[in-house]
């Protein structure tokens, strides 16, 4: 269900010729049909949400095709022209380097980088926002970047919740409870849902849910009897906050709305929204 202000609506893409119009319409159809309430203050916030989801997906595929390597923090490596490898295996932006240039370099020269899956997901989020922000704004928000697991910049606002409905562009987590300690890096897999039953996980590539579970199960202890599984954790960019920094070039997605109800009482506790 999609709510704009206090109105329950069925949005649609007005310009069928805009980039990725069909994919964005699919996002809207999924969100409209889900039980979860997707609440936005304005149409511009919803437009941003659609575009950031699309850029998360395209950035995930770009990273997959870049040659970016899977490594543990012990063996991680980076392009030293833009980043300094920390003692813990993270990547610290070099002084005087623009974060926008350094993030783009990861996608341009992926073979010069290697790290684990959580860091890769945060890199994808940064790249998606870079596509929607002026470089000056991006560099201001994300100066002095550190890429290291979930230690992301304080200006990157994310929402993590449970029991929601998965929409393309969401980050999900596969858990492997009986992982072999000899390959502890396979205790789970962070993955971007690409839509149409496919996910991208750094280290596993583009796979279905069943294929990712199969790969994780293959890395369990010999006597394992509990299968890996897709958890109900969902992580998203907080479009209500992050949309305020977006550039208006390129233009926002043009949306039309079919009104369903305009007197909804909207109650939000944490990241869960309920309609009365």
UniProtKB/Swiss-Prot annotation:
Family (UniProt): Belongs to the bacillus TGase family.
Highest taxon in the source lineage: Bacteria
Lineage: Bacteria, Bacillati, Bacillota, Bacilli, Bacillales
One GO BP annotation of this record: sporulation resulting in formation of a cellular spore
Enzyme class: transferase
Keyword Oxidoreductase: no
Entry GO MF terms: protein-glutamine gamma-glutamyltransferase activity
Keywords: Acyltransferase, Sporulation, Transferase
Role noted for this protein: Probably plays a role in the assembly of the spore coat proteins by catalyzing epsilon-(gamma-glutamyl)lysine cross-links.
EC number: 2.3.2.13
Gene name linked to the record: tgl
Catalytic activity: L-glutaminyl-[protein] + L-lysyl-[protein] = [protein]-L-lysyl-N(6)-5-L-glutamyl-[protein] + NH4(+)
Protein name in UniProt: Protein-glutamine gamma-glutamyltransferase
């Amino acid at each position: 269900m999609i709510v704009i202000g206090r109105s329950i609506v069925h949005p649609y893409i007005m310009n069928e010729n805009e980039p990725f119009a069909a994919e964005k319409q699919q996002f809207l159809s999924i969100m409209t049909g889900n039980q979860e309430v997707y609440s936005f203050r304005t149409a511009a916030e919803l437009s941003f949400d659609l575009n950031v989801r699309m850029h998360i997906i395209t950035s995930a595929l770009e990273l997959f095709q870049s040659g970016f390597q899977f490594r543990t923090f012990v063996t991680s490596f980076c392009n030293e022209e833009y980043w300094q490898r920390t003692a813990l295996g993270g990547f610290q932006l070099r002084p005087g380097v623009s974060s926008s240039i350094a993030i783009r370099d990861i996608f341009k020269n992926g073979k010069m980088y290697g790290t684990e899956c959580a860091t890769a997901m945060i890199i994808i989020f940064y790249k998606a926002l870079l596509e929607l922000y002026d470089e000056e704004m991006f560099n201001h928000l994300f100066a002095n970047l550190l890429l290291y697991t979930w230690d992301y910049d304080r200006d990157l606002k994310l929402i993590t919740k449970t029991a929601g409905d998965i929409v393309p562009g969401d980050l999900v987590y596969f858990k492997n409870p009986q992982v072999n300690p000899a390959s502890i890096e396979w205790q789970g897999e962070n993955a971007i849902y690409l839509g149409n039953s496919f996910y991208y996980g750094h280290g596993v590539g583009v796979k279905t849910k069943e294929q990712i579970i199969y790969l994780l199960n293959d890395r369990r202890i010999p006597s394992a009897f509990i299968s890996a599984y897709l958890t109900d954790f969902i992580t998203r960019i907080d479009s209500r906050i992050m949309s305020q920094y977006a550039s208006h070039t390129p233009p926002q997605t043009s949306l039309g709305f079919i009104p369903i109800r305009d007197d909804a009482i909207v109650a939000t506790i944490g990241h869960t929204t309920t309609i009365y």
